[in-house]
Amino acid sequence: MEKEVIAYLDNETIIDSQSVKNTNLKEIYFDNSKESLEVIRHSCAHLMAQAIKSLYPEAKFFVGPVIEDGFYYDFCVESKIGEEDLVKIEKKMKELAEAKIEISKYKITKNEALAKFQNDDLKQEVLLRIPDGAVSIYKQGEFEDLCRGPHVPNTKFLRFFKLTRVAGAYLGGDEKREMLTRIYGTAFADKESLKEYLAIIEEAKKRDHRKLGIELKLFTFNDEIGGGLPIWLGNGARLRSKLEHMLYKIHRLRGYEPVRGPELLKADAWKISGHYANYKENMYFTQIDEQEYGIKPMNCVGHIKVYQSDVRSYRDLPLKFFEYGVVHRHEKSGVLHGLFRVREFTQDDAHIFCMPSQIKEQVLEILAFVDNLMKLFDFSYEMEISTKPEKAIGDDEIWEVATKALKEALDEQGLKYGIDEGGGAFYGPKIDIKITDALKRKWQCGTIQVDFNLPSRFKLEYTDSDNEKKQPVMLHRAILGSFERFIGILTEHCAGEFPFFIAPTAVGIVPIGEAHIAYAKEIQKELLELNIDSEVYEKNESLSKKIRIAEKQKLPMILVLGDDEVAKRSVALRDRRAKEQKNLSLDEFIKLVKEKMSEVYF
């Protein structure tokens, strides 16, 4: 079965095997390749829908797309479906797969489809979103549904799948519309890959940053405050502060100038930038003195005004501004997810104003910055360049110069990268930085975006060597993306065992009895002078309980202090990795933690 063809590839378009007449196209085999999994998972979504329709005849279906690592389907039923119902749905799916049902495709006009599904309000919603013309329908047995495809030719290919969870989802993501049931699932071409993925899911549940955020007292959310608005608790605020201070120093060493723009700007500024026309639905607006103001969703306009605050010469360039900018974006409640998707967040944002000839040099500097930071946190990463789309501003020559500079910078660093042809923004090419965590999940974090648009809109200029006015190029640059999202990713990546240099509490100090508390607090004070946070466990509890409490907080180091340690001015050190205790003099311990802290400087 591994060598059976399930679809074909025409450039970047996947086509069903039953639709292909030109066999010169690239074949897609039944395996775990990216293209094959897209077909398998798309088909499995329909298999799930067919099973649901069989078990719940009143079911109506909205959309069922392929997503990263799986698929989902949104639908409505009279019955309440919970996690316990997934077993019987899976059982029915297996029956349908074993029945080896042929899957076929036919086309009708949009008007015919509207008539065909006239009694199905969800299908009417789908058709409203489809342009006029022919629409395709996929049929397997008695079940059929609107779909662009592609699909496998027979349900026999759909053997290795798992339904993973049930959730609610507003119709079309609009919280003002009805709530639908959403079931998520995944599928693979072989049993081993499915088994490996399910093991990762189980581990991911243990590492879920929302769960660890509560257990480690990092952050919380509160309905009275509002959705998507994280509240940082003491441990989380310390973690974040350490990350901010570390990055501040690195930025300064790399020649960035700290700046700060207001969080509230007149709507006129957003009209000039284009956000008012193109991004208004994602922004928050208010009236002040009968004038409209918008809360910033991005920091770029403030940095542009910093640039415009002085006359600029080619000798001044590049100018590198950075800010920990608090931004607000109107996210629908249905997509909010812990720290990964919030309405208020802080970007590690920088903007570099330079000449076109300086793009490569600046990108090289950013790539070195990225590499050092990712290695520090033990992330692997990959890059992708997005090139000029059909609709773009700026002449071909400057696009070519910018795109070539991005490619040459990546080549010079010896970095592998993908190319998303035509995937760039209309105002310039970009590099996306995608990190891979300990569970082999990929996360979009940083971006290096070349921008010809805003310098033009705000009429930015500098005087060149010939005393002529020229327009600079603007590079938008974020490495973490946002502190909130990065901390969420980092929490799951290290399962809450944060590196020593940013751990909210790096050292737990456990005095055995009351007579040892004074020495414990002396050590705590000495550590604080080194910018190392520690906690003294001085409650009147047993030694074993104190140690258990410290271990549950996933502290990098635990010190146990008794009569012997006080007398010798030493410590009994328990390392969370080694899980064994060793004795050090206080001076040796202080030297050790200084070495640990020195790891962050590069």
Curated annotation (Swiss-Prot):
Q: Does the keyword tRNA processing apply?
A: no
Q: What biological processes does GO assign it?
A: threonyl-tRNA aminoacylation
Q: Does the keyword RNA-binding apply?
A: yes
Binding-site residues for Zn(2+), renumbered to this chain: C300, H351, H476
**CDD domains, alphabetized:** ThrRS_anticodon, ThrRS_core
**Localization:** Cytoplasm
Q: Which cofactor does it need?
A: Zn(2+)
The record, for PROSITE patterns, names: AA_TRNA_LIGASE_II (PS50862)
The UniProt annotation puts the region (Catalytic) at 208-499
Cofactor: how bound: Binds 1 zinc ion per subunit.
GO CC terms in record: cytosol
Secretion signal, residue range per the UniProt entry: none
Q: Which Enzyme Commission numbers does its entry carry?
A: 6.1.1.3
UniProt main location, coarse: cytoplasm
The reaction(s) this protein catalyses:
tRNA(Thr) + L-threonine + ATP = L-threonyl-tRNA(Thr) + AMP + diphosphate + H(+)
Q: Which residues cross the membrane?
A: none
Q: Which UniProt keywords apply?
A: Aminoacyl-tRNA synthetase, ATP-binding, Cytoplasm, Ligase, Metal-binding, Nucleotide-binding, Protein biosynthesis, RNA-binding, tRNA-binding, Zinc
Role played: Catalyzes the attachment of threonine to tRNA(Thr) in a two-step reaction: L-threonine is first activated by ATP to form Thr-AMP and then transferred to the acceptor end of tRNA(Thr). Also edits incorrectly charged L-seryl-tRNA(Thr).
Q: Which HAMAP family match?
A: Thr_tRNA_synth (MF_00184)
- Which family would the database say this protein is a member of? Belongs to the class-II aminoacyl-tRNA synthetase family.
Q: How does it assemble?
A: Homodimer.
**Protein name, please?**
Threonine--tRNA ligase
- Organism listed in the record: Campylobacter jejuni subsp. doylei (strain ATCC BAA-1458 / RM4099 / 269.97)
Write the lineage as a comma-separated list: Bacteria, Pseudomonadati, Campylobacterota, Epsilonproteobacteria, Campylobacterales
